[in-house]
A protein has these predicted regions:
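Active-site neighborhood of phospho(di)ester-bond hydrolases with catalytic His/Asp-centered motifs
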Residues: 1-4, 37-40, 69-71, 95, ...
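Mid-to-C-terminal alpha-helical segments outside catalytic/metal-binding sites
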Residues: 2-8, 18-35, 208-215, 222-254
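Acidic-and-aromatic substrate-binding clefts and catalytic sites of carbohydrate-active enzymes
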Residues: 12-19, 43-50, 72-80, 101-108, ...
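A general structural detector for well-ordered alpha-helical segments in enzyme core domains, enriched
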Residues: 23-27, 52-59, 82-86, 109-113, ...
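Catalytic pocket-lining loop regions of alpha/beta-barrel enzymes
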Residues: 93, 106-215
Length: 254
């Protein structure tokens, strides 16, 4: 099983102990995970993602189980070249942050990025949020990703594959039930921000949306890696054998 939501690097708004790739490797081994799609956390709040992408590839090079998931900003000059270079260097997925870039749900450049990723068979990874609004720094002014953003990209083309991390039940349902069955199949979700008992939101979504719509994500080092494992362990007995999707199967590019 692959972790789709892991990061290395510092966080601008609070101290994170040991956000380093060698520590992440040990964390994944402890959790029984085969690897991770890894982003470079500081790049989210930087206008130009190129220096962060360079740092990401360099940091992960000694660790074959850590697959880079760099940022491609589609309103930036020569973004197509950035995408091609990232794929040539082994990117497992491409990250984009439309809320941090001030892009609306129907921004044409985001659609172009989704189409470009779909054409080469690489998932486009979107992050709903990094922290709850109650603890978010006032300097972090980006809003949460909206259901409208996800629906617009899912409708762009049949080749598009989206992985959405950090969503709660409300956002997931608003997105999922606003799509056709074919469009629903283009979107996968992690469940690190979805409640287990006593609310049992995850169990409800396994029953209604389907366990196959979910992938595994920890959000390390921002969140405890044990959270998603605990959510699975605390599912009702009739759902404990339900199989989520291994994210490594989502890309047809090799």
């Amino acid at each position: 099983m692959i972790d789709v939501a892991a990061y290395v690097g510092s966080y601008p708004f609070r101290h994170l102990p040991h956000p380093d790739p060698d520590v992440l490797v040990r964390v994944l081994e402890r959790e029984g995970l085969a690897g991770a799609w890894v982003g470079y956390l500081p790049s989210v709040w930087q206008r130009d993602p190129a220096p962060g992408n360079t740092a990401l590839f360099a940091a992960l090079e000694p660790y074959p189980t850590l697959r880079p998931a760099p940022i491609v900003r589609p309103d930036w000059p020569r973004w197509e070249h950035t995408l091609e270079e990232a794929l040539d260097r082994g990117a497992a997925a491409i990250r984009a942050y439309p809320m941090h870039w001030g892009m609306g749900p129907y921004d044409p450049s985001m659609r172009e990025l989704a189409l470009a990723c779909g054409a080469v068979g690489v998932p486009l990874l979107l992050t709903t949020r990094f922290e709850d609004l109650r603890q978010r720094s006032p300097l972090d002014v980006a809003s949460d990703l909206t259901a409208a953003h996800v629906r617009a990209l899912a409708r762009a083309d049949a080749s598009v594959r989206l992985v959405v991390t950090g969503a709660g039940r409300e956002m997931l349902e608003e997105t999922h039930w606003g799509l056709t069955p074919a469009e629903q199949g283009r979107v996968h979700w992690d469940f690190a921000w979805i409640w287990g008992p006593p609310e049992d939101h995850l169990a409800h979504l396994f029953r209604t949306v389907g366990a196959e719509r979910f992938v595994y994500g920890t959000h390390w080092p921002l969140r405890l890696t044990q959270n998603p494992r605990a959510n699975l362990d605390l599912l009702p007995a009739e759902l404990r054998d339900a199989s989520i999707t291994d994210a490594s199967t989502l890309a047809f590019r090799r």
